Amino acid sequence: MSKLSNAQLKAFDEWLFDYRDIERKIAIRKLELQTPVSTDINVGGGKFNLVAKETEDIVIKWSKDGKIKSYENFRESVDRVKALLDDELNYIFDLRWGTGSNNTWEEIAYKIHTSRAGTYRKRDRILTLFAQQIGKL
């Protein structure tokens, strides 16, 4: 198994900060898609003979939208990684990338009573699992 470079570690670390806002991003995108725009294909014509199925149309838009798929894939990948982590690594994950958390790795080391090097090894483990989950390692 190859090892992640420092640049990759930093990139994945930054990327995981998006996890705290992923539900909001999905909800906003869904609202954008369901906001009505002019979909009248019968401009200037007479009677429109098709039954309007607004709910079905919205769900189809959601299921075909690339942005929503990307957000959901990211969320599912992170959730699978979290399922693989033990309690301590999950706690570290929440301290670093959880909602409302802005801890540095040094602050996390202090909070979990571990050396900085030990905390960085645990970070590397979490980020390596994430890289494997998304197919980058």
Where in the sequence are the language-model features?
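N-terminal interaction/assembly modules
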Residues: 1-82, 107, 136
